[in-house]
Amino acid sequence: MKAVLLLLCALGTAVAIPTSTRFLSDHSNPTTATLVTPEDATVPIAGVEATADIENHPSDKAEKPSALNSEEETHEQSTEQDKTYSFEVDLKDEEDGDGDLSVDPTEGTLTLDLQEGTSEPQQKSLPENGDFPATVSTSYVDPNQRANITKGKESQEQPVSDSHQQPNESSKQTQDLKAEESQTQDPDIPNEEEEEEEDEEEEEEEEPEDIGAPSDNQEEGKEPLEEQPTSKWEGNREQSDDTLEESSQPTQISKTEKHQSEQGNQGQESDSEAEGEDKAAGSKEHIPHTEQQDQEGKAGLEAIGNQKDTDEKAVSTEPTDAAVVPRSHGGAGDNGGGDDSKHGAGDDYFIPSQEFLEAERMHSLSYYLKYGGGEETTTGESENRREAADNQEAKKAESSPNAEPSDEGNSREHSAGSCTNFQCKRGHICKTDPQGKPHCVCQDPETCPPAKILDQACGTDNQTYASSCHLFATKCRLEGTKKGHQLQLDYFGACKSIPACTDFEVAQFPLRMRDWLKNILMQLYEPNPKHGGYLNEKQRSKVKKIYLDEKRLLAGDHPIELLLRDFKKNYHMYVYPVHWQFNELDQHPADRILTHSELAPLRASLVPMEHCITRFFEECDPNKDKHITLKEWGHCFGIKEEDIDENLLF
């Protein structure tokens, strides 16, 4: 019996270890964590965090032995249930056929863990790993390990992405469902045995599909470009899903904001002027540490397109393909309207269509972001007090006897008309007093639209809220208290532990960001119906010179040393992309200055994926005046002062 168990363990491990180290094709899906994505405009280093996580999180090591024990138990049970030896022989033949590839114990165990339970694939890498390039530690990862890890995870996540892009592939959809079931089931439940058998059978099916589906990979490579430029950071498909999860959250929230703003008057132009910059906000990993977030990641494939716009426009701190363009669309002042950004809230930073409009609705979030709270102008604060007083008056008005029936009917009619052009901040709704004068009152959290997992938001109080609507409604109720003043939207997604950013890590940002911005422009320039018209004639003329340059470094998982060498050698190719990104963010108002509210949407979307983003913004504001000028922005990216030109902002 022991001999059989040992053989089963060996076979299980062999199946778990990726047998092909070939890189993805140029058209492969440039997901957020894909380690090798030549075509992607994503920034490298996502895979390093898988290794770094093993080093920084000893708890993962403790999970490995338990995973092996679980597999032994599963194989023993499956053997007792008439699992024939011929199946074992098939697995062994499959192993021999795939090739003999050496993998260190740590890597093998990591792959095994991923295969045994897709419910915790995201726990294998650092939480900071996200849409933006990971830390420089990538250069220390063995290429074979990166390739193996990528391949192992790819075999797990391939069905997920395919199920979203090609619904008619039932086998992939089945695996998606099974992966979600495994997340909700406890390893000790008897159903684990059945899931293990199904996983092994699916793996056999996946390997041939993996090898013979270049067209799928090409479609996937294009799909993320359209729907999730933010998650186009290089990494495995699994990490990509997680990224998608987070990026999709702004989109979901933007829809909620739109609904809310429609109810509460969309014409708050006068109020927005009173609130100043904070109300005119401008506009991303990773790997959640909970099974719930794993599910979010898979569901996020559909919504990520919307998030990309928000992340990208906010600020290209974390090169996530195409995250730059519409990212800033994501968050804006309390206007709750969708006119704050010119790009969509989806992570498809380059799609100037429906997602483009949805991104604009996200602008209402930035007013409440970490920095937005501190930037409230005196006018904004006085308005808060005025609204608080209005709330009390509204309550008195509601408790007092109403006018005659005829007057009441006229009042309601006038009320509807008044609120139509009267906007309130997030967490408030418009109501009218008996005289028909509109004013804002706090929204009841229970009146918020039904929230999904992807709508979750983390507040600065380290509490996870069902949605941003619930968070701002709670903040409104706490107005006048210290807790209410401090409560802001920290980032999208459930709250998690975010490590501190080191000097070494933040120093690598400009390298990855410049390359990322350049690659995004290349993608926008290439013929694509969904991207058509995004760049104007002047922009296309500038980008064309870079696109046709034979010396251009193609998108891919490049080491920091190569990025640095290319920047020195082809410096002229990076000047315009930096100016273009600044112009994309500087929208509300377009005054050649970036405020925290204009950067906030990108930050909120990327904080859970890239922990250095906040510090990066601080580094770009050396005088600490909470404003980043074009000159400061250019210096932050290593552009020479003589090459910083406002004429390039078009």
Curated annotation (Swiss-Prot):
Q: Where is this region: Disordered?
A: 51-352, 375-415
Pfam families from the UniProt entry? FOLN, Kazal_1, SPARC_Ca_bdg
Q: Where is the composition biased (Acidic residues)?
A: 91-101, 189-210
GO BP terms: signal transduction; synaptic membrane adhesion
| Residues covered by the EF-hand domain | 608-643
| Residues that hold Ca(2+) according to the record | 621, 623, 625, 627, 632
Per the record's keyword annotation, is Protein biosynthesis included, yes or no? no
Entry-annotated residues carrying Phosphoserine = 70, 78, 86, 155, 163, 272, 353, 406
Report the Gene3D superfamilies cross-referenced here: 3.30.60.30, EF-hand
Signal peptide as annotated in the record: 1-16
Query: Which Gene Ontology cellular-component terms appear in the entry?
Result: extracellular space; glutamatergic synapse
Comp. bias intervals (Basic and acidic residues) = 54-64, 75-85, 277-299, 382-398
Which cysteines pair up through disulfides? They are 419-430, 424-440, 442-476, 448-469, 458-495, 501-612, 620-636
Going by the UniProt record, its keywords in alphabetical order are: Calcium, Disulfide bond, Extracellular matrix, Glycoprotein, Metal-binding, Phosphoprotein, Secreted, Signal
According to the entry, every stretch annotated as the Kazal-like domain falls at 436-497
List where Polar residues composition bias occurs.
Answer: 116-126, 135-148, 157-174
Q: For this UniProt entry, what is the primary localization, expressed as one broad class?
A: secreted
UniProt lists the family membership as follows: Belongs to the SPARC family.
State the name under which the record lists this protein.
Answer: SPARC-like protein 1
Which organism's genome codes for this protein? Mus musculus
Originating gene: Sparcl1
